[in-house]
């Protein structure tokens, strides 16, 4: 008899346990799927049965209404009244989100056109764009338009202007001018005496 290592036996046990657990799990999933399918089929059959019953009920009331319309003269003369139930309206309900969807579609379209036409000065501003297509929108600007200033304009100022003042102007005053040192400096000392009367 061959003796296995304890770790080998433990590993085999783990593998067996995992495989059994996976098999059990798959079995449980299959069982749940079966139950869910059976429940869905049950509810679908019940719903179809109730729908067919309701259609027959409505058809019966429709026959009663037709009979009432055919015998309206008789009821007016005899005074008898027949109770009838009104058939619920089968008019399809209007989707309340349709205006919102249309508005969002219009906004996205305008934004797309503005982004597409940026730079060429053409945008579609009409409210009704049902007959508007992208084919009549220019996508490229004309390539022969002038884009820069003329290149033959003079760019430099004339360089022949005089930059220096004349150097032959007199810069010194004459040094032989009288300075006032030889003017008389003494005043007369024999001033006139004025006589006084007592």
Curated annotation (Swiss-Prot):
Keywords: Glycoprotein, Secreted, Signal, Virulence
Annotated function: Effector involved in the disease saprolegniosis in salmonids and other freshwater fish, resulting in considerable economic losses in aquaculture. Within the host fish cells, Htp1 is involved in the uptake of the S.parasitica effector Htp3 at a neutral pH (pH 7.5) and its release from vesicles into host cytosol where it degrades nucleic acids.
Signals that turn on the gene: Highly expressed in zoospores/cysts from S.parasitica and in the very early stages of infection on Oncorhynchus mykiss (rainbow trout) cells.
Motif (RxLR): 46-49
UniProt organism field: Saprolegnia parasitica (strain CBS 223.65)
Domain notes: Has a conserved RxLR motif that acts to carry the protein into the host cell cytoplasm. Lacks the 'so-called' EER motif, which is found closely behind the RxLR motif in most of RxLR effector family members, but the presence of an EER motif is not always essential for the translocation of every RxLR effector into host cells, or for inducing a hypersensitive response.
Protein's name according to its UniProt entry: RxLR effector protein Htp1
Keyword Cytoplasm applies: no
Span of the signal peptide: 1-23
Single GO cellular component term: host cell
Family named by the database record: Belongs to the RxLR effector family.
Residues carrying covalently attached carbohydrate according to the record: 70
Subcellular location: Secreted; Host cell
Region annotation (Disordered) ranges: 48-101, 115-198
Comp. bias regions, Polar residues: 70-91
Biased composition (Low complexity): 173-191
Biased composition (Acidic residues): 126-137
Subunit structure: Interacts with the effector Htp3 within the host cells.
Keyword Secreted: yes
């Amino acid at each position: 008899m061959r003796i296995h290592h304890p770790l080998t036996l433990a590993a085999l046990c783990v593998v067996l346990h995992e495989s059994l657990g996976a098999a059990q799990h798959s079995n449980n999933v299959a069982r749940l799927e079966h139950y869910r399918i059976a429940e869905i089929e049950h509810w679908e059959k019940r719903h179809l049965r109730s729908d067919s019953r309701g259609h027959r009920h409505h058809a019966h009331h429709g026959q009663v209404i037709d009979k009432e319309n055919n015998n309206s003269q008789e009821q007016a003369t005899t005074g008898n009244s027949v109770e009838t139930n009104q058939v619920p309206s089968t008019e399809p309900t209007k989707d309340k989100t349709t205006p919102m969807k249309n508005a969002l579609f219009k906004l996205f379209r305008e934004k797309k056109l503005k982004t597409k036409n940026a730079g060429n000065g053409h945008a579609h501003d009409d409210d009704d764009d049902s007959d508007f297509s992208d084919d009549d929108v220019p996508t490229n600007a004309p390539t022969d338009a002038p884009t820069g200033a003329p290149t033959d304009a003079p760019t430099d100022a004339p360089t022949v202007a005089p930059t220096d003042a004349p150097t032959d102007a007199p810069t010194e005053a004459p040094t032989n001018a009288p300075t006032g040192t030889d003017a008389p400096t003494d005043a007369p000392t024999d001033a006139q005496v004025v006589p006084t009367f007592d």
